[in-house]
Amino acid sequence: MRILTKRKITEKAEVERKTFFDIVFEWEDIFSKQLNLPILARTEWEFGFDERCRKVYQKIKVPFYRLYSLIDRRGKNIFMFDCSTKRQDGIYNNSRYIPCLIDYFLSDEEYGKFLRAYSKNPLVLVSNRDVYEYLQKKGCPIPIEHFPLSLPDYYWNDEIYEKKYDLVMFARQNPLLVEYINMYENKHPDFKLVRRKYECGHYIYYLSATGETVSIGDSHEEYVKLVSQSKVAVYTTPGMDGTRTDANGWNQVTPHFLEEIAGQCHIIARYPDNADTQWYEISKICKCVESYDEFEQLMDKYRHEEVDLKLYKEYLQNHFTSKRVDMLRSIIEKYHLY
């Protein structure tokens, strides 16, 4: 097996996309090193060819993308992360490629599009346990395996972090939690809150009370540093309370949750009870707040209380990327993907 990466293509991408892909590239590097899997670069030419063929196919139903298989000399059993589940057939829908779906936000009506987009792949890995069980119940004819997302082992540090802020608002925000944060800030003038805005291609982190810039969060490293400086973090699954309008009700646990644990943050969260949140046992770390009063009580407590580092470390042992290396090795052996 080999790994196909998008890292060259994302070099010119906007900050938001680049920081999203950083952890994906870290997973790829770990899998490559631990399983001795060569990394192949996806080229801008093939990316452009795939995009153009898809656009043409929408107008005239001629699958020009099938021509790519005639010139593709990479061989078989090529693993690739698919950050967004495709709704349309393309150059990677053939027996050579094994996609791992990170985000699955298709509606039930789009199930047929999923089948067509991955019909020729010998195996599809699905990160969301809820989606995996949904596809099983649908009788999905494509071989699928559950392959959950993870956190590189080196993110954990036994050193106790010095906290500079009560709350840093990083990552995508849940509108209900934002409402609670605004209410809390108005009632507590001493609340040290860092907000985020996107200006001129950069994420600007600034103190809410003064407007003073504390960070230009253009890199994943700077993001991780900010997480480690926040006493409390708010977390939400994508489809909760309209956080992502395109989520179609899907709510999976994302790496942000694991990053907040590694950053030694207390976590106040909004999430549903589903197969994925149960698989991650998210309730061991945080409960789903149901009211502002509950939010306020937790924030008051967490601003003055240390986290349980022993609990956090033990929890992450099951979700480090080294554990996913073992899972991928088992999948390779099960399907003879050598």
Per-range role (PLM):
Residues 2-68, 73, 81-90, 108-119, ...:
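Nucleotide-sugar donor-binding catalytic core of glycosyltransferases
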Residues 79-82, 90-106:
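Active-site proximal beta-strand in glycosyltransferases
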Residues 100-102, 118-121:
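Pre-catalytic or accessory/regulatory segments outside the catalytic core
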Residues 102, 149, 290-291:
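Active-site donor-binding loop signature of nucleotide-sugar glycosyltransferases
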Residues 123-124, 287:
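A residue-level structural signature of the nucleotidyltransferase/glycosyltransferase Rossmann-like core
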Residues 282-289:
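A short acidic/histidine/glycine-rich donor-binding loop in glycosyltransferase catalytic cores
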Residues 290-293, 297-338:
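A charged, aromatic-enriched C-terminal amphipathic alpha-helix characteristic of glycosyltransferases
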